[in-house]
A protein has these predicted regions:
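Outer-membrane beta-barrel signature, preferentially recognizing the C-terminal barrel domain
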Residues: 390-409, 593, 597-606, 660, ...
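Short acidic/polar hinge/loop motifs at secondary-structure boundaries
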Residues: 72, 197-225
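Short, acidic Ser/Thr/Gly-rich low-complexity loop/linker segments typical of extracellular
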Residues: 57-68
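Extracytoplasmic beta-strand/coil segments of soluble accessory domains associated
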Residues: 158-197
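Short, acidic, small-residue-rich periplasmic hinge/interaction motif at the N-terminus
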Residues: 25-32, 38-45, 50-55, 84-88, ...
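Transmembrane beta-barrel wall of Gram-negative outer-membrane proteins
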Residues: 266-370, 395, 405-412, 419, ...
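Gram-negative outer-membrane beta-barrel transporters
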Residues: 745-747, 765-858
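N-terminal periplasmic accessory domains that precede
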Residues: 104-107, 157-160, 177-180, 192, ...
Length: 858
């Protein structure tokens, strides 16, 4: 905080210096005027990304995400101002700038542009907004508006993101959860709300679960693939910014309702949405409120396999699982926004959003273990085993595992105009949490089995041997099913963020060689805690209830499970029986291994930046910037030790507090060349970073001498740094549409992955397996992006209601300087989590409110 106050003092000193400069030219400055306003269409919908240009001064600005624009430092007089927007008729108007005052001038554009008898109507409004924002942006940005999102059956932000060029997603239960930008892992990109990074409720990563936020709760999704100096620098892949619904230009109201059906759960889904906005007190006060509710019962069929390399160097299957999931996800989201125009030069904004997701899950799993042990042991016994497991919870949680995730973000900001100087400030508080109360597992195990695996080398192998809880009793004690696990855990993860920032913008000169300077400072304080407490009641259950579970079975692995008929129904302990057990009356043993992942971390990041924008004639714009980010982190965790004795005695000891500090300097240089009004070329160089996971930094030592395994944290981890080059060309059609191509290169240094070593010696003890996160080396990432979007009205006017949208991204990665012990000379390694191909295609029909789309995502 002290560092932030010093930065603010420095910026105030710069302001006072600037003030002295103004004083020297006080006559001219006093007479300078300002234009401020908002761009809307005839239905009073805001138009972000509109171009506002004064030909006489060769000066232009672009409306922001809420449609506002500001022209400062204008000599009094009368000017012709031109406002243009793709798909709208341009407007030219005479404006007289008053001396020393601010003129408020809103502009209304007429919907529909007649071009060779092709009329672009309101059905394509969302495309126009997105295309205008991309067209007028200095960097490389992809934009999706709310009404575009609404035309696809996307329930959450993650599903909406997968349709953007260069983005692929990781799924959970059929829904997009984490987003990956330009072939980088989800850890290497950031997710922000209104420019502030979202806290994460994930325990092991900084990732944000995108399926937590309903798609209908945002106004715009911006994917900034080039990060400029006025943005947070921790975004190697890119920055995904979610712009929440802002106050309207006039009263508006909307309500939506929808449904669906899931064939696995055999239940209907429900989607509801409500939005209301208005302005009060002679339009000085604006308000927007929105509510979203979704209830989605679903399910999934899942088979998973684990492989290893044997002593002969052969890849062999060691484990196979078949899983049946039944999941219900209920999302509630509430947002509220106010803005107040104190006068034409000063505006305050208050925004808040709260998201809440209940995730009730039951899982029924069969595990076939030790599949690589195909022969008999020295005693003539088969060496494979099976486990049957039920995952659930208590009756108050529907006898299911409840994962309750919540996020909230509350921000207060101000925009002020002091003569030539613009001042924007903001303060925000955000919190994310995940609660898993009374999560229960009931697992049964049978040993001395032998399985037959079919198609072991293919993508979908399967076990033909029948596994049943009713088998094995005739084989005596050795063949019986035994209670392996009966556990209940309670977990809480929460992260709190507090941020303050102040930015200044000073226009220096106007004209074809006009320029401006931006500078500012930011302070972000983050705390994160993970607390898990787990007890095992298996021994007490066996002594008390013996085989009572056999009277409470349910048949799962449903009919129609996966393609084919090779998967047979299996009996499991029912979720109702598992939930009914009174574990509070049983004596349980704490599972210290689960608590060994607990930690506390506090991170403070102080940053400052400057950004210089320069026009190099009428067609070329340049932006040069530098950002400094100083990071200080303090953390502690736990060491877990399992003794190699008869009782396998466990201990848990605190690691103590550890600290780490570092400073990063992040330069950026961007160019944009307007070949003409429709063809735009962009080039940029930027430097970005990605900070290590909190859980990876904890200097814990977890020793399991029973299994002879060692897991360690690594407090010496350094941030991953990336040097980024981008080139792109975009052509924008007069009617709504574009064609674009781009190439990008990233030189990524010190990427982090887990190192796994066999037969590892630590403190004179040898361990079968050693795992530790490590800065593994460097990587080159090269990619190509292509996109095409257009309606078919250019072929024939009657086809204007039909269009096509398609994207394709290719990425290739190559690891260099790989420093894992014993693997230094390995070649042809790719960056973890990097897909080679991603693609989207959509053929659509839109006419008179009727919308049909056929979409494909790869």
């Amino acid at each position: 905080m002290k560092r932030f106050l010093r930065l603010v003092s420095l910026t105030l000193l710069i302001m006072s210096t600037s003030g002295n400069t103004f004083a020297e030219e006080k006559v001219n400055v006093a007479r300078q005027g300002t234009i401020r306003g908002r761009i809307v269409d005839t239905s009073k919908q805001i138009l972000p990304g509109a171009s506002i240009y004064i030909e006489k001064l060769h000066t232009g600005v672009t409306s922001d995400v809420n449609g506002y624009y500001t022209f400062a430092n204008l000599t009094p007089g009368t000017y012709t101002v031109k406002v243009s927007y793709v798909g709208y008729s341009p407007v030219e108007m005479k404006i007289t700038i008053p001396a020393g005052k601010t003129l408020e001038k809103d502009v209304v554009l007429n919907e529909g542009l007649e071009l060779q008898e092709v009329v672009v109507g309101g059905a394509f409004q969302g495309q126009r907004r997105a295309i205008n924002s991309q067209k007028n942006n200095l960097g490389i940005t992809n934009v999706v508006s709310a009404d575009q999102v609404g035309k696809f059956p996307d329930s959450n932000i993650g599903d909406a993101l997968k349709r953007i060029n260069g983005i692929n997603v990781q799924y959970d239960q059929g829904e997009a959860r984490f987003g990956q930008v330009r072939g980088t892992s989800a850890d290497l990109s950031s997710v922000t709300i209104n420019g502030n990074r979202l806290p994460s409720a994930e325990g092991d990563t900084r990732n944000v679960q995108l399926d937590l936020i309903p798609a209908d709760m945002v106004q715009t999704i911006e994917v900034n693939k080039v990060v400029t100096s006025d943005m947070d620098g921790d975004a190697i892949g890119g920055s995904i910014n979610l712009v929440t619904k802002s106050t309207p230009y006039k009263r508006m109201f909307s309500a939506t309702a929808g449904t669906g059906y899931n064939w696995i759960s055999q239940k209907a889904q429900l989607n509801l949405g409500f939005t209301y906005g208005d302005r009060f007190f002679n339009d000085k006060l604006g308000m927007m409120a929105a509510i979203s509710y979704q209830n989605a019962p679903s399910g999934s069929d899942d088979v998973e396999f684990e492989y290893d390399v044997n002593k002969k160097g052969e890849v062999v299957m060691v484990e196979a699982q078949k899983r049946q999931y039944y999941v219900t996800r209920e999302r509630q989201s509430y947002s509220l926004a106010f803005d107040y125009d104190i006068n034409p030069n000063h505006r305050l904004t208050l925004q808040g959003i709260y998201n809440r997701r209940h995730d009730w899950e039951n899982r029924y799993r069969v595990t076939y273990k030790d599949l690589d042990k195909t022969g008999l042991d020295d005693e003539g016994d088969m060496q494979q085993s099976a486990q049957i497991e039920t995952k659930g919870g208590t009756p108050d949680n529907r006898n299911a595992r409840l994962e309750l995730q919540q996020t909230m973000d509350l921000s207060l900001s101000g925009e002020h105009q002091f003569g030539k100087l613009s001042v924007n400030w903001g303060a925000s508080y955000a919190r994310a949490s995940e609660d898993r109360p009374n999560e229960r597992y009931f697992s049964l195990k049978q040993d001395f089995l032998g399985f037959t695996v079919v198609d072991a080398g293919d993508r979908f192998p399967y076990v033909t041997t029948d596994v049943s809880l009713h088998n094995g009793e005739a084989d005596g004690e050795r063949g019986k099913w035994k209670v392996k696990e009966l556990t209940e855990s309670n977990q809480e993860i929460y992260e709190k963020d507090l941020k303050f920032k102040v930015d200044f913008e000073l226009p220096l000169t106007n004209g074809i060689y006009g320029n401006s300077l931006r500078f500012g400072a930011k302070y972000a304080s983050k705390t994160k805690d993970r607390n898990t407490l787990c007890y095992d009641y298996a021994d007490t259950y066996k002594d008390t209830f013996d085989k009572d579970y056999m009277n409470n079975l349910t048949s799962q692995i449903r009919d129609g499970y996966m393609p084919g008929d090779q998967y047979k129904p299996t009996d499991f302990v029912s979720k109702e029986y598992l939930g009914s057990l009174d574990l509070s009356s049983m004596e349980g043993e704490q599972v210290l291994e689960e608590s060994s992942g607990n930690y506390h971390a506090r991170e403070n990041v102080t940053s400052a930046f400057f950004r210089f924008d320069q026009n190099l004639g009428k067609k070329i714009k340049m932006m040069a910037g530098l950002r400094m980010e100083a990071t200080h982190i303090k953390y502690n965790g736990w060491n877990w030790n399992v003794a190699d004795d008869k009782d396998e005695t466990e201990t848990l000891e605190p690691t103590g507090n550890h600290k780490n500090s570092y400073v990063n300097w992040l330069p950026s240089l961007l160019f944009k060349y307007d070949v003409n009004d429709d063809l735009k070329l962009r080039a940029s160089f930027t430097e970005t970073l990605s900070r290590p996971k909190y859980s990876a930094l904890i200097p814990c030592v977890n020793i399991n001498r029973s299994d002879n395994e060692l897991v360690m944290g690594n407090s010496d981890l350094t941030p991953t740094i990336s040097y980024n080059l981008d080139l792109s060309a975009d052509y924008y059609f007069k009617s709504v549409g574009l064609i674009s191509a781009g190439i990008f290169y990233k030189k990524i240094n010190d990427f982090i992955v887990d190192q796994v070593i066999g037969d590892y010696t630590y403190q004179n003890n040898e361990y079968k397996k050693f795992t530790q996160p490590k800065n593994a080396g460097d990587a080159d990432l090269l990619g190509v992006e292509l996109a095409y979007q257009r309606d078919f009205g250019f072929i024939a006017p009657a086809l204007k209601c039909i269009g096509f949208y398609g994207t394709y991204t290719y990425t290739h990665t190559q690891v260099n300087n790989f420093n894992f012990e014993g693997r230094e000379n390995e070649k042809d390694l790719s960056l973890p989590g990097s897909p080679e191909h991603t693609a989207n295609a959509s053929l659509y029909f839109e006419k008179k409110g009727f919308n049909v789309r056929f979409s494909y995502n790869y």
